[in-house]
């Protein structure tokens, strides 16, 4: 599995996300205002989307085509465009 080389980095991100979700849970339990709860949820969602982008980009580079190593310029450009599209959609 290619994510093993980044395992500690990915796990740290997941743990931060867990902390954000737990903060949202505490805010709901203590009946904080809607704006605060929404802010906490939005932060967790952003963190999850960023994690998704990182894992998808790694997957594309490791299992589909690595634009930096691809000799076929059209495939390399297509891979870069796919990575850019994923980034812009999920951020």
Language-model-detected regions and their locations in the chain:
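Solvent-exposed interaction patches of small proteins and small membrane subunits
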Residues: 1-91
